[in-house]
Structure formats: structure tokens, C-alpha cells
């Protein structure tokens, strides 16, 4: 099948890649404080309870859109049986298009470098900086009312936090463990190399 697909196209490439990771049994209140801190659009969707159910970063038409959503809630609404031992399940999903799809490995790393929360800020952070970060995360529209150099300062602080963040580092490790196998599989689809049909 892979050889057949390869023979059909002169320059085979991916125009879209969806890469997802499930986050299981991390409390909802902990997860919902995470943000992609890049200067891209942010669209949160809240349920009737007022709790975050889905968050989008980037527009649907952009080359990169990141979505964080309550996968357990989605499954329950679709009447999918969820194992009783799973308390929470969130999914972080990156949808990449055009050139970003081809450069999927770097785009995942870049997205994770911007996936931050207030949970693991440096212990020596100034109290005023912690208050501002809490305010920016609680009310993302506040980003639009602060000066450009101030935005840069707090984005940089959050990106530093991302390097110490236990959850984000776990996602990095999981991706690192899977990336080589995923790349090998994608390469065989694209290039028809080293494919043994059984």
C-alpha cells in the first residue's frame, strides 16, 4: 500500500499532521491553568458549570492550532464507556498544516516550550510578578492591555517556567520516546523507504 501511494505522487508530502497526547488523572483545576504563551489567539470554551472544557490557541485556518480539551467529558457525552479507575483525562492536540506539518518534530517541541502554568514558577519570583501572571492566566484578555515589553517579560517568565514544569517535562519525555518510531513510520509513507510488505 505504501509503495502504491508513493508511486502515485511525484513529490509526496504531508499537508496536515495531528499529534496528540493524553493527560490522565491530573486534577482538572491543575490542567485548566495551562496556557500556550505565544502571541496567538486564545479561545476558551466553558461548560454550564463555568469550568473550562476546551481551549484553542491559533485560528482554525492557521498553520498551527493547539487544542486542550476534556477527553473524558467528550467520551461520556458520546456514551463511550470510560474505565472507572480514570478520574480525569485531558488531551493536548496539535494540528499542523502545510510547512508546519512537514516540520512536525520542531513544532511539537516549540509548542511544549510555550505550554506553561503558574505551578512551577521560580521560588525567587517577585510577588508582583506572580500576581500579574496569575491575572494573565485567569483573564487572558489582560494581555491586550499591557505594554509590548511587559508582554515579552511575562511570556519569557512563563517559558522559563515551562522548562521546570513537571507535567510539560513529562510530555516532552513521552514525545521523545515516541518521536523516532513516529518519524520512521512517516518516512516510509512519504518516501517508500525500507518498507517490507508482509
PLM features: residue spans?
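Structured, helix-rich domain cores that form ligand/interaction pockets
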Residues: 1-150, 161-198
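Helix-turn-helix DNA-binding segment
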Residues: 151, 155
